Structure formats: structure tokens, C-alpha cells
């Protein structure tokens, strides 16, 4: 069986692109030889779980658990399946008109270990999993005829030791397959191999770095040519209008059978800034001329934005810029039983990455432990979400030179996306070669972004340290401690007390570079409301072993609300990204959705993020007394003195009224009072308050509504108060539901 499909081709005067996305024949073998017969179909892009009929080991990859067990990590070597070779096959017609052209097959992303055959000739192989692979197929093609393309994709078990492909101790299965676009391009004997448009908004220019690939044969005999003259024309247009705002032609020589580097700068006419609120895009076009003949034309989108740091803060286009958002762990989501083809559904991804985040005032996302298909970045470019882009490096894997090769390819490949503002080389680890040798080298290639090196700080990196990523998981101890009541008496965690510093917070306060808290919480749930593998003890401690999904979700929402308020109240923190916006269900952690993930139905935690992440907000600085067990109850009829904490992430003053409401266990408002507040730009304001507590013992809810001038709806903060000894359970409080 062979897959004969029409292909979609488009030309750009010098380059013709033939898309090979679509349905391919597919099958698996235990040995490294192709199957005699192909019995399945598979979409490209798409991992092996999308094959139909299903692959034989499908149930091993996606078995749903009967219950929750406390598990801290998984050793990848303890596999419960048989590694297989995966074979993608199809035929494509190559027109006779291309016989004088140079043809390349490009696979944007494929994992793990990819070999390509055209008409039974091997044309190349690659161990890279997260960056594009280009294969010269010119010599193997039959023109005016159908051509068989066969792609073998290996298993993670066979990834060579030198490959820059880390492991993730919170993953169990690493699904192989082709997971980004596949296409053929036809050009002349010189072609754009790679290009970077690197903006400087402050200077009003863009620096363009180009690698030109020459396909002329190398010098074989003495006196044969080694180089050929060429011209490269650069043209910058506004993406939406097509108006040309900059143009330049340079001349040079391209070394035969090699890649040649060119660099130039282009001044732009009245450049418009790219920001999350106004994501203005340009198109950068590169045309290569060989003996005055156009032989290739290639274009990319980019944006004019300057992302940098000043002291402990990030800056965007010269202004202080606080990052607010969450994390995406797509490689983990791939092992979700409900993942299916959602990762390649543009509308679903737009809702996940753009619509939902912007609805709650998020402006940023961390692509965590592994990058994403290229169109995800395109969406963030187009709609204005800034990204911290992290390689899959958690547990160490890879030899230095191969890591250098893959990371360099990564910067060239993803470096035109204005949404990517931070390269994240490592997650929660240390690597001296990456931090002190490779990052400075890559900073020379792309000086327009900041590098994060995991847990490496200025102590290990000196002046190479541009930012840190602290992870203040204050509830982590709950995973192991068997005597939690005694633990909290000796190590009190007053959840909601915004003024109290955590013992691990000193390094954040003392650091001299921006601190991006891109993980915190440790309060994950599965989408059915059950605790995750890492948080079973958390919920058992606070709620008991038979808590309902609704009770678990309410605790999670409240906990994350208060921890977010705590972090945002420390204004020296440069950004806060909650963990996690998308991950696999039934795993070690969890995300902010409930029920079927295809519907992206937000959990209560996500709905409360609208308030604690509001750019301008007012929080209650009081410790929780509903769930925490080590605090004494408040005295009935006493005066409660506390602060309201106003925070402002914006470069303009925020002002308005704060309405305080005290509700009893039935939701009845028993008292109100009003305060006025003004918060300076990028500032913090402490507003002292005095509240007369009721004389009746019970469980109460204190709500602060911040009615900001110019904002339609109030921003809420809440605290549960235990007054007297009448309350015996967390159930004896009013459940406040957001509309």
C-alpha cells in the first residue's frame, strides 16, 4: 500500500515549496528494516499515537490509572514497552520543470533519530529532535515521475548519548514521530540556508545575519573555482500593508559546497514597536542572485522590539516590564490520553495560548521542558504573548559539541520570532559548559534576547548571569513529612501573610539580576479533581483522604490565589509564571483545566487568576485560618489590624475605592467598609485597615473589592477568618463562587 496524495505547492520567484503535510502510510517494526506491507495511516505532522488503526502498544502508552499513588519521579530506563522503528511512507510527483533545480526535503521537527530515503536511496540522517533537518535529495529524485519518500523515526531508547535531548523525570513515555511541517523546496545552486532579522528599535534598524548555501561542486582539480560571486538583496515590508520600509543590496562570494556567512544592517522608515498590546509585524525578505539571476527568495516575519534588563527588572522597548503568565509542557501533554491531534489544531492552540491568557491579563508564557511546533510561535507573534523558550534539558543528556550544534541551530531556527524574548537553556540544573562557554557564544549570534541557565546564578556564571529562575515551592515539604502538624508548628507557613518572607526567599531578594519565578504552587490536580502523583499528601493533610473534587478545586484556587498575591507583593520579582497551564492528565503535576481537554474548560484556579494577576490589584495581607492548622483562632469582638497591599505593574497611576465585605458561613454580609487607595506607576502601596470582628464565633470570609477607576469590574482578594472556637472543619465556611 502506498499513499498517493496531491501536494500543495507555492512559488516565491526563486523558490518553490511543496508541502508534504497530510496523510502518509505508516507502520512499525522491531528491527531496523521497513515493513513488507503498510497497514496504517498517519497524519503529518503527528506522533505515532495518531496512527489508524492504533499501534499495537497504544494501551501501554495511554492506560488511565485506577487511583492516585504518591510517586516522586520516574526512571526512563524502566520502560514498560518494546521500542519500535516507525516508518512514514508516501509518494510525491516531482515535475520535469525542476530538473535543473536543487531540491531539499525539510522536516521541521522529528523525534527520535530520523533517517530519510528517497527512491530507496538514503539521503541523510539526524539525531536532532527539536530543530529543522534539511536533506539534499536532488541526486535521488526522478523528474516527471512519482517519487517514494520513506522516513524512519527511531525510539527515545536509541537516542545517541551525544544528542542534546534531555530526560524529564516527570515523564513516563516519550512518543516518537514527525511533529512539525514537512516540505520540499526547489531553488538554484545558491540558497538561503538560515537567516536572522535582529531588531534594534532604539536605533531604528534591523541587523540581518544570513547563511548562504552553495550547491556548486567543490574544487576537484588544481585551478578549479572555490568561490562564486553573488548578490543578496534584503527587503523589509510591513506585514499587513506590504509597504516597503527598508531595502539593501550587498555583494559577496559564496564558498562552493559550503555555507557562507553574511551580515548587514538596514535602517527602517519610522519603525513601529512590537508589544503584547500592539504586536506589529514586519516581513523580512532575502533574495539571492547568482550571476544576476534570481535563484532563491525566502521571507520570515519579525517584530521591532527591544527586550533587555535594567537592574533586577526586565524592560520592553525601554520600559519596565513585568511578566505575568504560566507554563506549557507540550512534551508531557503528548502522553495525555486525550491529547490526540489537539497540538496541531490551530484554533485550539490559539484559544490555549492567546484567548484564555489574554482574558485574565497574562502577557507571557514559558515553553517548558521542550519546545513547540513552529505555528505556536507564529500565533504568539501575531497576537502578542511573550515567551521564555526552554529546551528539553532537565536531567543531563548530551555531549558538549553536539549540544553546541543543536542549540546554535535552535537560535537560528526560532530567532526571528518577536514573541521569544528569553532563551532558556536548562531547567532546574547546572551545566558549566552551557552557562559559561556556550551561552556567551550564542549571545554573540543573538544579542537581542536574555539567556536563562536554570539554577545557575552569578555564583557559577559571574557576569554571564542575566537572570535567575527561582522556584519557591513552599508546600514541597508536604510530599514527604509524616508529622505535618509538628512540622508546621516548628516551620510555620502562614499562607496569605504577604509580609512574611520565606527562608528560601533571601536569595531572590539579594540577587542583582532579574528574578523570574516561573514555577510555584505544588498544589496540582488532575482534571477530574483528584490530586496528582506529587500532591496526594497535600490534599490529605488539609482536607482529609475523602475530599471531593469540588473541595480539592476550591483549596487549589484559594492556595494559588494567595501565593500569587504573596509573590506579586514583592515588587523586586521581575515576573511570575504559575505552573502549569498545560500538561498531561494523570501525571505528576496538573494544569488549570477540568473535564475534556479539547474544550479547554477553565478550573476555579484559572478563574481566580483573573484577580490575583490583574495588572493593578489590591490584596489582603492576612494569614488564612480556614485550612492552616497551626494558627490560633481570632478573638470574637476584637479589633483586627492589617494592611491592604496595592500593586501596580503599569506605567501609569492606579486609583480607586476598596470595598471590604465580611461574610458569615451562609454568605450573609454582616459588615462593610470603604477605603480609598492610590498606587504609583510600577509601585506598591500599604493601606492600614482596622476591622471590628463579630462577637459570634464562626467561620467568616473577608473580601476586598478593588473598584479601579476606568475598570468595569472589581478585582477581588479574599481571606478566610476563624473567629472563636466554634469552627471545627474547613467545611464550616461560605464558598464564594465567581460569576
Question: Residue locations for each model-derived region?
Answer:
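Beta-strand-rich binding/interaction modules
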Residues: 116-118, 205-252, 637-678, 684-689, ...
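Terminal connector regions
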Residues: 278-279, 286-298, 656, 694-738
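Extended acidic/polar, glycine-enriched regions
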Residues: 142-146, 213-310, 704
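Substrate-binding/catalytic cleft of secreted carbohydrate-active enzymes
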Residues: 349-352, 364-596
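Active-site-adjacent substrate/metal-binding segments within catalytic domains
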Residues: 51-94, 98-106, 111-119, 124-127, ...
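Substrate-binding clefts and catalytic carboxylate motifs of secreted carbohydrate-active enzymes
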Residues: 16-34, 48, 83, 110, ...
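Accessory beta-strand-rich segments of carbohydrate-active enzymes
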Residues: 27-29, 78, 82-192, 215, ...
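Extended carbohydrate-recognition surfaces in non-catalytic/accessory domains of CAZymes
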Residues: 12-106, 161-178, 525, 582-585, ...
Amino acid at each position: 500500500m502506498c499513499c498517493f496524495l496531491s501536494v500543495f505547492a507555492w512559488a516565491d520567484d526563486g523558490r518553490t515549496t511543496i508541502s508534504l503535510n497530510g496523510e502518509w502510510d505508516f507502520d512499525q517494526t522491531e528491527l531496523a528494516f521497513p515493513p513488507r506491507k503498510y497497514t496504517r495511516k498517519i497524519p503529518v505532522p503527528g506522533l505515532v499515537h495518531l496512527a489508524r488503526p492504533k499501534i499495537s502498544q497504544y494501551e501501554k502508552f495511554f492506560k488511565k490509572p485506577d487511583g492516585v499513588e504518591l510517586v516522586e519521579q520516574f526512571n526512563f530506563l524502566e520502560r514498560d514497552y518494546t521500542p519500535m522503528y516507525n516508518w512514514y511512507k508516501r509518494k510525491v510527483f516531482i515535475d520535469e520543470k525542476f530538473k535543473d533545480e536543487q531540491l531539499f526535503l525539510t522536516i521541521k521537527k522529528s523525534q527520535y533519530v530520523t533517517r530519510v530515503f528517497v527512491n530507496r536511496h538514503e539521503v541523510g540522517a539526524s539525531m536532532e529532535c527539536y530543530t529543522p533537518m534539511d536533506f539534499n535529495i536532488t541526486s535521488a529524485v526522478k523528474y516527471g515521475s512519482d517519487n517514494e519518500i520513506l522516513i524512519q523515526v527511531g525510539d527515545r531508547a536509541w537516542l545517541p548519548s551525544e544528542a542534546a535531548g534531555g530526560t524529564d523525570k516527570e515523564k513516563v513515555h516519550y512518543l516518537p514521530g514527525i511533529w512539525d511541517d514537512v516540505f520540499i523546496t526547489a531553488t538554484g545552486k545558491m540558497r538561503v540556508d538560515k537567516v536572522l532579522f535582529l531588531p534594534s528599535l532604539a536605533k531604528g534598524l534591523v541587523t540581518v545575519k544570513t547563511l548562504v548555501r552553495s550547491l556548486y561542486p567543490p574544487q576537484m582539480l588544481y585551478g578549479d573555482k572555490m568561490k562564486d560571486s553573488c548578490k543578496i538583496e534584503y527587503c523589509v515590508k510591513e506585514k499587513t500593508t506590504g509597504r516597503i520600509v527598508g531595502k539593501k543590496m550587498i555583494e559577496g562570494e559564496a564558498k562552493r559546497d559550503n555555507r557562507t556567512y553574511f551580515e548587514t544592517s538596514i535602517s527602517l522608515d519610522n519603525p513601529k514597536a512590537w508589544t503584547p498590546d500592539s504586536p506589529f509585524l514586519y516581513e523580512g525578505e532575502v533574495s539571492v542572485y547568482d550571476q544576476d539571476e534570481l535563484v532563491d527568495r525566502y521571507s520570515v516575519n519579525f517584530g521591532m522590539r527591544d527586550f533587555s534588563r535594567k537592574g533586577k527588572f526586565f524592560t520592553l522597548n525601554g520600559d519596565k516590564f513585568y511578566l505575568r503568565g504560566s507554563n506549557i509542557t507540550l512534551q508531557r501533554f503528548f502522553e495525555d490520553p486525550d491529547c490526540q491531534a489537539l497540538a496541531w489544531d490551530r484554533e485550539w492552540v490559539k484559544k490555549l495560548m492567546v484567548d484564555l491568557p489574554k482574558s485574565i491579563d497574562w502577557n507571557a508564557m514559558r515553553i517548558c521542558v521542550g519546545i513547540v511546533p513552529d505555528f505556536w510561535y507564529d500565533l504568539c507573534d501575531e497576537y502578542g504573548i511573550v515567551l521564555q523558550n526552554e529546551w528539553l534539558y532537565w536531567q543531563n543528556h548530551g555531549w558538549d559539541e553536539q549540544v553546541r550544534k543543536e542549540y546554535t541551530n535552535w537560535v537560528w531556527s526560532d530567532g526571528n520570532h518577536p514573541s521569544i524574548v528569553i532563551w532558556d537553556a536548562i531547567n532546574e540544573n547546572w551545566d558549566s559548559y552551557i552557562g559559561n562557554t556556550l551561552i556567551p557564544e550564542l549571545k554573540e549570534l543573538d544579542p537581542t534576547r536574555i539567556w536563562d541557565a536554570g539554577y545557575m546564578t552569578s555564583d557559577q556564571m559571574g557576569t554571564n548571569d542575566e537572570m535567575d529562575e527561582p522556584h519557591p515551592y513552599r508546600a514541597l515539604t508536604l510530599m514527604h513529612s509524616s508529622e505535618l502538624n509538628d512540622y508546621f508548628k516548628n516551620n510555620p507557613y502562614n499562607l496569605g501573610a504577604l509580609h512574611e518572607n520565606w527562608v528560601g526567599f533571601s536569595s531572590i531578594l539579594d540577587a542583582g539580576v532579574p528574578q523570574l519565578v516561573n514555577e510555584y504552587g505544588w498544589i496540582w490536580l488532575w482534571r477530574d479533581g483528584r490530586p496528582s502523583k506529587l500532591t496526594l499528601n497535600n490534599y490529605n493533610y488539609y482536607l482529609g483522604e475523602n475530599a471531593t473534587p469540588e473541595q480539592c478545586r476550591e483549596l487549589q484556587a484559594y492556595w494559588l490565589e494567595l501565593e500569587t498575591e504573596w509573590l506579586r507583593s514583592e515588587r523586586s520579582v521581575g515576573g511570575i509564571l504559575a505552573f502549569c497551564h498545560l500538561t498531561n492528565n494523570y501525571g505528576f503535576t496538573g494544569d488549570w483545566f477540568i473535564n475534556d481537554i479539547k474544550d479547554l474548560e477553565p478550573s476555579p484556579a484559572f478563574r481566580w487568576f483573573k484577580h490575583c494577576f490583574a495588572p493593578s490589584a489590591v490584596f489582603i495581607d492576612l494569614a488564612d485560618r480556614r485550612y492552616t492548622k497551626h494558627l490560633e483562632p481570632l478573638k470574637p469582638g476584637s479589633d483586627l489590624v492589617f494592611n491592604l497591599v496595592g500593586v501596580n505593574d503599569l506605567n501609569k497611576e492606579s486609583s480607586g475605592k476598596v470595598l471590604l465585605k465580611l461574610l458569615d458561613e451562609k454568605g450573609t454580609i454582616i459588615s462593610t467598609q470603604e477605603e480609598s487607595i492610590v498606587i504609583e506607576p510600577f509601585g506598591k502601596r500599604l493601606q492600614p485597615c482596622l476591622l471590628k470582628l463579630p462577637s459570634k464565633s464562626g467561620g467568616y470570609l473577608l473580601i476586598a473589592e478593588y473598584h479601579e477607576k476606568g475598570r468595569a469590574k472589581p478585582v477581588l482578594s479574599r481571606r478566610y477568618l476563624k473567629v472563636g472556637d466554634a469552627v471545627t472543619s474547613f467545611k464550616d465556611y461560605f464558598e464564594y463562587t465567581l460569576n
